[in-house]
Amino acid sequence: MLWETSSLRPPTGARDFLPREVQRRERLEAQLTQVFRRYGYQRIITPTLEPLETLLAGGSIRAEAVLQLRDGEGTMLGLRPEFTASIVRAAATRLASGPLPLRLYYHGNVFRNSRREEGSYSSQEFFQSGVELIGAGGWLADAEILLLLADCVRAVGLSNWTLLLGDVSLTESLLNSVTPKAQAAVRRAIAQLDYVYLEAAPLPEAARQIGLQILGLRGQPEQVLPQLAQLPVSPERLRDLRQLCQILEAQQVRVVLDLSLLQTLAYYTGIVFQAVVGGEIIALGGRYDRLYALYSPQQLEQPGIGFTLLPDTLLRLLPPTPQDEATGCKRLVVPLVPAGIPAALALAARWRESEAVELELLDRSPEEIEAYARRCRIPEIAWVQADGSYHISPVKYPEPPDPTGHCGPR
């Protein structure tokens, strides 16, 4: 029998979301959507399944990180591991003749293979919400994205967060003097914040010192910017970074500059950033000015920048609210006798024009009906008589809500 096998469980890395969890997620998405739209962003929905080549973004994403399959014609396909590549592909083809800049937002699930041990991978499904701004370069576009991110974090109710801000172009300029072989080792140490490796690894001394120098470029803008000014980096990029920090601080965004911030995706070309709360990443993103040309039939270039929020992490960090306990249903309509069913249906239809209403469908006693309403956090019961008259009684909630969101019998 099927119930005797493991087939009834989702695969490792995937899970069911029960009604109350879905309700919290939908409320979070609605809060984010409201902020996205206030900035002029429009929703885009791209396929979950894309040609593998599209998803790899010119080699920026490792093939083994993508869940792959083959269609009936032998074409290699993949489940999207992130949204940016698919959205830029759509922008460079379907939206190429439209007005710029493009302001697009998304909500949806992504899939990745994560390495567990050498040669072993596990698949994971998780959710992302985010935006892409395509066709606008410069520090002012960077500022819009970061201020939008700040407004999103505020809208969902988190206050004690920090923006870690780096710039790939500045970090790359410091690494340019390092040989390619040593550069790979230094990058790995920087990405893992591994001071011990940098001190002990058999590296040229110049490469070691540059790696340690980059790891040391982390702190408040007023501390890091003067240090950067003494190094061989672009004065224009440094000026833009200073202006960006000033704008963010004027909006009460807590900024930590971090030149060791190297995102795992290789398509970033300018600023990169993470929003963190208590050491947990709740959002990340950056500028990708060379990605558009990979998908443009005419090989046209357009700058781009975006971020993704991590709803699963946000929901874990956000405290429960009274709204989380309610099903959303405002009233339960109960025909007391069969002759009252037509009137009960009419009442439910009328009230549903403005609110959520349930109809009692089972042959239960008044005590069982009240217990059901309590478990589901339905505030009122309308008891309908045979002649169509009714009375409404409030429901009290002495017991805690069912955490599964399921209102059936225990």
UniProtKB/Swiss-Prot annotation:
The lineage of its organism: Bacteria, Bacillati, Cyanobacteriota, Cyanophyceae, Synechococcales. This is ATP phosphoribosyltransferase regulatory subunit. It is found in: Cytoplasm. This function is generally fulfilled by the C-terminal part of HisG, which is missing in some bacteria such as this one. InterPro entries: aa-tRNA-synth_II, aa-tRNA-synth_II/BPL/LPL, HisRS-like_core, HisRS/HisZ, HisZ. It comes from the Bacteria. Heteromultimer composed of HisG and HisZ subunits. Keywords: Amino-acid biosynthesis, Cytoplasm, Histidine biosynthesis. One of its GO terms (molecular function) is histidine-tRNA ligase activity.
